[in-house]
């Protein structure tokens, strides 16, 4: 039987040493699922609310005992006896139980932990890998990894405003090969940074955080690493940026400390990004405008939307209501998918499906505060999202996802495909 007979929530620590929620779900058949939720550093204001204790005497207010208590009481009571195979009904029960748009009463962290653990228990009972449980038995695409090799912004303590500078192995023949290419570039980049006398310590997501003169210096350093690793920039390995622009948008201006403190209008910032795209093989820009600068987003989309993937993260926060508005207004051409921004798997899958129907791409993503949980790897494959963003080529919390993707590709064998540049179908 698939009936839920026990739910156990607990407080664990994430990759930054901050508390997060883990949940075990036990079924009548003896099957069990365990899941842990991530947490972000730069968060959109419209994200579902993760419940924190606020007790400054314990983890500086970041404890999650209230969320855990909600899991072990209200959520447990509501889900007890439900069929774990009925994911949509389970998630709808959670949403109705919380009763708020932002999931602030029970906490999106508590709700997501339950949603994920139920799915894992159901997959375990079915004898299926999680990606097969979600995605069925047909052919599947492995995702192109967006590898964050230089960190800035809220993810690092350096002079760069942009949060992530990424490499995308679009010319590889398989995910395994793409991962190898990325790892080789990462190690060459480390040597180049060290040779310049800069620190090779890594940031929250495993990328380097050197103090460079400006953003173009960072881009040029990455291109040099790609070339010295033996690869062709652009055709084999392209570049991506996560600007996280909301972090440096104030009073209608984008103020870039890493560019000499210049303050730019939306049009001027769009022009700067367009200039970089003309000079360098940049094919993806995330949060190129601030989450509330919809006019700026429209300018950027009109200017670059036919040749560059424009990903809405803080803009859309994995929310179908906001995504629908963006599609209607012709804003962006891609959505970043973060499961903890919305709080249930059902709503996550709905956002991916809505994006695809509109010709937008969907990039499944980690958060800067992660755990060893690798659910997003299975989601990326199961939904044929074809892109994943899960950090650099270091830190075991990031490698957990990459290694799971290696296992999935091995298991799929000849029915796995690697789309490469075709993953960017929004640019055709």
Swiss-Prot record:
UniProt key word Metal-binding: yes
EC number: 4.2.1.11
Catalytic activity: (2R)-2-phosphoglycerate = phosphoenolpyruvate + H2O
Pathway: Carbohydrate degradation; glycolysis; pyruvate from D-glyceraldehyde 3-phosphate: step 4/5
UniProt keywords, alphabetically: Cytoplasm, Glycolysis, Lyase, Magnesium, Metal-binding, Secreted
Sequence positions that bind Mg(2+): 242, 286, 313
CC per GO annotation: cell surface; extracellular region; phosphopyruvate hydratase complex
Protein name, as recorded: Enolase
Organism: Bordetella avium (strain 197N)
């Amino acid at each position: 039987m698939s009936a839920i007979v026990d739910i156990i929530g607990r407080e664990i620590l994430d990759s930054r040493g901050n508390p997060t929620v883990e949940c075990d779900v036990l079924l009548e058949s003896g099957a069990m699922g365990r899941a842990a939720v991530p947490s972000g550093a730069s968060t959109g204001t419209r994200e579902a609310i993760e419940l924190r204790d606020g007790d400054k005497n314990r983890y500086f207010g970041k404890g999650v005992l209230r969320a855990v208590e909600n899991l072990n009481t209200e959520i447990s009571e509501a889900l007890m006896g439900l069929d774990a195979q009925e994911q949509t009904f389970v998630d709808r029960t959670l949403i109705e139980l919380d009763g708020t748009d932002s999931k602030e009463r029970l906490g999106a962290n508590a709700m997501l932990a339950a949603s994920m653990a139920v799915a894992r228990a159901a997959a375990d009972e079915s004898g299926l890998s999680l990606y097969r449980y979600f995605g069925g038995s047909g052919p599947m695409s492995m995702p192109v990894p967006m590898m964050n090799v230089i960190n800035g912004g809220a993810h690092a303590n350096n002079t760069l405003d942009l949060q992530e500078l990424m490499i995308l192995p679009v010319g590889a023949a398989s995910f395994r090969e793409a991962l190898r290419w990325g790892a080789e570039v990462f190690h060459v980049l480390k040597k180049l940074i060290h040779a310049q006398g800069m620190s090779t310590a890594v940031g929250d997501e495993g990328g380097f955080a050197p103090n460079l003169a400006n953003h173009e210096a960072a881009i040029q350093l990455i291109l040099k690493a790609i070339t010295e690793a033996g690869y062709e920039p652009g055709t084999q390995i392209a570049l991506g940026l996560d600007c996280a622009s909301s972090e440096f948008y104030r009073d209608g201006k984008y103020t870039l400390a890493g560019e000499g403190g210049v303050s730019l209008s939306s049009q001027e910032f769009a022009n700067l990004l367009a200039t970089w795209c003309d000079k360098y093989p940049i094919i993806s820009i995330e949060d190129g405008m601030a989450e509330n600068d919809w006019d700026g987003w429209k300018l950027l989309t009109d200017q670059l939307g036919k040749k560059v993937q424009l990903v809405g993260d803080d803009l859309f926060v994995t929310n179908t209501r906001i995504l629908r508005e963006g599609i209607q207004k012709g804003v962006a051409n891609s959505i970043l998918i973060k499961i903890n921004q919305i709080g249930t798997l059902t709503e996550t899958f709905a956002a991916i499906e809505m994006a695809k129907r509109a010709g937008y791409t969907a990039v499944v993503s980690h958060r800067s505060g992660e755990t060893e949980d690798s659910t997003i790897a299975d989601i990326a494959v199961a939904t044929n999202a074809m892109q994943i963003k899960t950090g650099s080529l270091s830190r075991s919390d990031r490698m957990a996802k990459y290694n799971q993707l290696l296992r999935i590709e091995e298991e799929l064998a000849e029915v796995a495909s690697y789309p490469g540049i075709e993953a960017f179908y929004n640019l055709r």
